[in-house]
């Protein structure tokens, strides 16, 4: 990606911070590209693959996202799409579909994704939403939301994608400080990924988000599905066209 499309080093900062918080996070760094003698900086970000999942201590499973096809249609095309098609989901890592078992897991994930109470099945969704509303609101758009399905628990883990990360004046509490050891480690990792030092604002955001995370993040191993959830389908998925 070109840096200006994702706020440059802020994208690297955000994915690294999510990793520190314990969220699965796509490996992201700044790289130098030489295209026919034209040298420029770009953002490298890994794909959501089996290797990504395993690096985050997750067994290979399905990653769901909403179908963003509708986003690219013109006004007339959208009318046709609304009349003839139902909202659908896309398997982000389609290489996962290898056999009947993986097909079943994907089908189960899609069925659960269509539930009215879906967001209650997403671990740490409230905290994830809170910090993205504050600093990376674009990442909460329906077409940018991705979810890793954990079949043996029947819950989902949020996966950040394309948040257009912005640190606007007046939104950050610079009174909150990150632990010295954490800050030192984070600064080292950030410099390795960007060849730049943390800015004062980035340091403030790190301290603020780490403070917000206190006693808010549930570890996957300690999370279990809520058996009282309503399994009724969201209305927009009930009428299959």
Where are these regions (language model features)?
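Active-site acidic catalytic loop and adjacent metal/ATP-binding pocket
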Residues: 118-159
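Active-site-proximal structural scaffolding
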Residues: 7, 11, 26, 121-126, ...
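ATP-dependent phospho-/nucleotidyl transfer catalytic cores
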Residues: 44-131
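C-terminal catalytic region of ATP-dependent kinase domains
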Residues: 136, 148-241
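A short, charged
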Residues: 1-13, 17, 75-88, 180-206
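Conserved ATP-binding subdomain of kinase catalytic cores across diverse folds
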Residues: 1-81, 133-136, 152
């Amino acid at each position: 990606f070109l840096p200006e499309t994702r706020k440059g080093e802020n994208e690297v900062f955000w994915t690294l911070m999510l990793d520190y918080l314990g969220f699965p996070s796509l490996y992201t760094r700044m790289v130098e590209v030489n295209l026919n003698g034209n040298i420029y900086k770009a953002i490298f970000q890994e794909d959501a693959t089996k290797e990504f999942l395993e690096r985050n201590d997750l067994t290979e499973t399905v990653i769901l996202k909403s179908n963003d096809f509708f986003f690219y249609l013109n006004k007339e095309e959208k009318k046709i799409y609304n009349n003839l098609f139902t909202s659908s989901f896309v398997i982000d890592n389609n290489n996962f579909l290898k056999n009947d078992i993986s097909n079943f897991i994907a089908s189960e994930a899609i069925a659960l994704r269509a539930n009215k109470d879906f967001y209650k099945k997403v671990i740490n969704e409230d905290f994830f939403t809170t910090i993205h509303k504050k600093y990376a609101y674009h990442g909460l758009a329906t077409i940018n939301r991705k979810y890793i399905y954990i079949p043996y628990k029947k819950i989902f883990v949020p996966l950040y994608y394309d948040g257009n990360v912005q640190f606007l004046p007046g939104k950050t509490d610079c009174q909150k400080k990150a632990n010295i050891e954490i800050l030192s480690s984070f600064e080292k990792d950030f410099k390795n990924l960007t060849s730049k030092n943390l800015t004062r604002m980035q340091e403030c955001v790190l301290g603020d988000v780490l403070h917000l995370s206190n006693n808010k993040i549930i570890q996957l191993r300690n999370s279990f599905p809520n058996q009282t959830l309503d399994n009724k389908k969201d209305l927009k998925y009930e009428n299959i066209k």
